[in-house]
């Protein structure tokens, strides 16, 4: 698929890039997709599922507005997700932490998603999400060290944790049992110490589409 999104979290510059929309599952036990990573439904009880998972978070290049700041390498994450399915709604809560790359700390991710099938081929989903990032995670993403400050002219900045909330919707047309076309749109809002970072307040935008 094709993705049009900010070139880094907090940016006001958008870029278009190719984005794979793979969605693979092995019955109700294993799953893999770009949004949720690779997971194993270790516990399945009624409408509840508990799954350990691994995934990936992208990094940030040090070019254009950020050319005098340090580059941030993306990395792998590991976490645990609990999900509850009730009628057309799917609720989930996950805790995840990196084990490679330049970002330390952890995140707590809460999601709710409404799903509806309009016909044999058309599907839609819509739902809110809330992500809390720890002090270390936020500092690695939005902080500015004394060295970076001297190079860039931005004020030194050492943030604490922050929350990001948003809304995401999708529309899917099924071509066959294996292939489909999906359009996804969303908006999110950075708050607190992330919103106040010079990377966002001076050269970026707290509202992300």
Regions found by a protein language model. Name each.
Residues 14-20, 46, 72-78, 104-108, ...:
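Residues that define the transmembrane beta-barrel architecture of outer-membrane proteins
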Residues 28-32, 48, 88-92, 121-124, ...:
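Repeated loop/turn-to-beta-strand initiation elements of outer-membrane beta-barrel proteins
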Residues 39-41, 101-204:
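Outer-membrane beta-barrel transmembrane domain signature
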Residues 22, 34, 50-54, 82, ...:
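Membrane-embedded beta-strand positions of outer-membrane beta-barrel proteins
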Residues 1-6, 30-38, 62-67, 90-99:
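Transmembrane beta-strand segments that form the barrel wall of outer-membrane beta-barrel proteins
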Residues 2, 24-26, 42, 82-86, ...:
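Residue-level signature of outer-membrane beta-barrel architecture
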Residues 1-5, 37, 53-57, 94-98, ...:
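Outer-membrane beta-barrel pore domains and translocons
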Residues 1-33:
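Short glycine/proline- and aromatic-enriched beta-strand/turn motifs that initiate or cap beta-hairpins
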């Amino acid at each position: 698929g094709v993705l049009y999104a900010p070139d880094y979290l907090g940016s006001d510059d958008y870029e278009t890039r190719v984005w794979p929309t793979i969605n693979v599952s092995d019955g109700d036990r294993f799953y893999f997709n770009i949004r949720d990573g690779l997971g194993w439904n270790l516990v399945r009880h009624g409408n509840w599922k508990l799954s350990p998972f691994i995934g990936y978070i992208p990094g940030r290049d040090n070019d254009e507005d950020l050319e005098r700041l340090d580059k941030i390498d993306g990395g792998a994450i590991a976490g645990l997700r609990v999900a509850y399915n009730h009628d057309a709604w799917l609720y989930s809560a996950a805790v995840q932490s990196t084990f490679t790359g330049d970002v330390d700390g952890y995140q707590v991710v809460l999601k709710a998603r409404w799903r509806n099938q309009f016909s044999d081929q058309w599907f839609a989903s819509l739902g809110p999400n809330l992500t809390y990032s720890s002090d270390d995670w936020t500092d690695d993403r939005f902080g500015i060290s004394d060295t970076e400050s001297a190079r860039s002219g931005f004020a030194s900045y050492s943030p604490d944790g922050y929350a990001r909330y948003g809304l995401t919707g999708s529309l899917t047309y099924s071509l066959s049992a294996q292939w489909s076309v999906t359009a996804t749109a969303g908006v999110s809002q950075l708050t607190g110490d992330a919103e106040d970072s010079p990377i966002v307040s001076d050269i970026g935008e707290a509202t992300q589409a």
